[in-house]
């Protein structure tokens, strides 16, 4: 879990900015969004397959150009 030690003369806004950056690096917000609603394993598989297909098409287009 991210944590920020605040120095005496350090403003709150700066500490908050550091904390948000640490949370972003740790991937906490994306994990929360992902777990917000339950997703059936079959739906997860479908989404994963669609994403793989998109990546493959993008890679092909890049090679053609």
From Swiss-Prot:
Q: Which cysteines are joined by disulfide bonds?
A: none
| GO (cellular component) term, any one | ribosome
The keyword Metal-binding is annotated on this UniProt entry: no
Q: Which InterPro entries match?
A: Ribosomal_bS21, Ribosomal_bS21_sf
Report the GO molecular function annotations: structural constituent of ribosome
Write down the Pfam families for this protein, in alphabetical order: Ribosomal_S21
- Entry keywords, A to Z: Ribonucleoprotein, Ribosomal protein
Q: Does the keyword S-adenosyl-L-methionine apply?
A: no
Which Gene Ontology BP terms does the record give? translation
Family recorded in the similarity comment = Belongs to the bacterial ribosomal protein bS21 family.
**Which PANTHER family does the annotation name?**
MITOCHONDRIAL 28S RIBOSOMAL PROTEIN S21, SMALL RIBOSOMAL SUBUNIT PROTEIN BS21
This chain belongs to which protein, by name? Answer: Small ribosomal subunit protein bS21
Gene for this protein?
rpsU
């Amino acid at each position: 879990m991210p944590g920020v030690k605040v120095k005496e003369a350090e403003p709150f806004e700066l500490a908050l900015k550091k904390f948000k950056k640490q949370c972003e690096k740790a991937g906490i917000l994306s994990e929360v969004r992902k777990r917000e609603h339950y997703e059936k394993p079959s739906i997860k598989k479908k989404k994963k397959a669609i994403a793989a297909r998109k990546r493959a098409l993008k890679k092909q287009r890049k090679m053609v150009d």
